[in-house]
Regions:
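Bacterial N-terminal signal peptides that target proteins for export
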Residues: 2-10
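Sec/Tat signal peptide C-region and signal peptidase I cleavage site
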Residues: 20-26
Length: 392
């Protein structure tokens, strides 16, 4: 299918890199640690690919985005930030920082703002979100049985109804509001993760999500598993990751307060749901084994293709039961172009293992794709690449 690429050049503290773009189908993201890049910067990015539904049953396949600059502002007591998608209100701080976002052009509708990514004046950037489906054993609902060999058993006779241990909270934090809630209030990536953790502790989460925060020194990766359970992880310099719409973070020790921010019930909730994998006595939990549902083929194909693209010598296969979140690479010269290559990959690099997804019938979605760099050499310098793809 032919597509037209709409390219936007952005400046201020941002440098826009205008790049032609084809993106993989569905929401996917990547991180490349600063120890693996040519210029010593963190690289991360995400593609958003979602056919927005309308009330009349039709779908919008070319969903426009707008770039907004929100100036620093002083607020008086009683001023609020409203999440129109839920009706939840968040009191403004007395002073909030300048920040920029790329948001849906329908941001004034009752669906919410949906500022998908942005920077603030302190050099903190974020992307929100890679949507992930919580495990039914935890949040409640139906889920298929899984055979001993890992196969998901199909058919209604193989569905199990689970009670809710920690259900999602309808009025909790959403993708629609999270960027506008976090960016104007923080000075570092860790502060961003801590603030979101605090909001989830107090209000809960309405969705399963994955969010990335970065500043000039650090990058934090956060997974939200249920109404109140989450883990944020300080990303190492010498690894890379590719993650579509499910949870991939593996073994962590929640007692490692320097590198881990974990909800208080992260182990106890999993135990109550009967899904805990780890060693509670040591504070260890395998998060993917505990909180991730069975790996869908669409997620498997994207993570496999991304890993092999960035490291062709990797020994992962399409049949692997799971994929490690932190991947190794012999390269130390990755650039923003490598991030672009991940995003425009359609499996054509897999030597026929998978059909290129633009050849699959029914492929008809819009994509917002962007890459960000956190440059450690300059606290006020953010590099930003953005391309929006629309149907011809």
């Amino acid at each position: 299918m032919n597509k037209k690429v709409s390219k936007t050049l952005l400046s201020t503290v941002l440098i826009g890199l205008v790049l032609s773009q084809q993106a993989v189908e569905a929401c996917s993201a990547f991180i490349i640690g600063k120890g693996l890049t040519k210029d010593g910067s963190f690289l991360y990015g995400r593609t958003e690919d979602y056919p927005y539904p309308h009330e009349d049953g039709t779908q919008e396949h070319t969903h426009n985005k707008n770039f907004f600059v929100n100036p620093a502002k002083d607020y008086k007591e009683g001023d609020i930030l409203l999440d129109k998608s839920t009706g939840t209100v968040y009191p403004h701080l007395k002073h909030e920082y300048k920040y920029t976002v790329v948001a849906d052009d329908s941001r004034d509708s009752n669906e919410g703002i949906f500022s998908e990514h942005g920077f603030n004046e302190h050099g903190v950037s974020m992307t929100a979100t890679v949507t992930a489906t919580p495990r039914s054993e935890v949040v409640g609902g139906k889920a298929p049985k899984v055979a001993a060999d890992g196969r998901v058993l199909e058919g209604p006779e193989n569905e199990v109804e689970y009670p809710a241990i920690d259900p999602l909270v309808k009025a909790g934090v959403t993708e629609a509001i999270v960027t506008d809630l976090i960016l104007p209030r923080v000075k570092t990536a860790k502060e961003a993760a801590q603030l979101l953790a605090k909001e989830i502790d107090e209000k809960g989460s309405a969705e399963g999500n994955i969010i990335v925060f970065a500043d000039k020194n650090e990058l934090w990766y956060m997974e939200i598993y249920s109404g109140h359970e989450y883990v944020a992880f300080k990303y190492p310099d010498d690894k890379y990751s590719v993650f579509p719409n499910t949870y991939f973070l593996g073994k962590v020790n929640i007692n490692d307060k320097e590198n881990i921010i974990a909800s208080k019930g992260i182990i106890e909730t999993a135990k109550k749901a009967g899904v805990f994998v780890g060693d509670e006595s040591k504070g260890e939990i395998d998060l993917a084994a505990t909180y991730a549902p069975p790996l869908e083929r669409g997620d498997r194909s994207r993570v496999y293709a991304g890993i092999k693209l960035l490291n062709p010598s990797s020994n992962v296969t399409f049949q692997d039961k799971r994929y490690e979140f932190l991947q190794d690479s012999p390269r130390r010269d990755f650039t923003v172009i490598d991030g672009l290559n991940v995003q425009r990959n359609r499996f054509e690099t897999l030597n026929g293992e998978l059909v290129p997804d633009d050849q699959v019938p029914g492929y008809d979605t819009k994509t917002d794709a962007y890459r960000k760099q956190a440059d450690p050499s300059d606290p006020n310098y953010g590099k930003y690449a953005y391309a929006q793809e629309t149907k011809m």
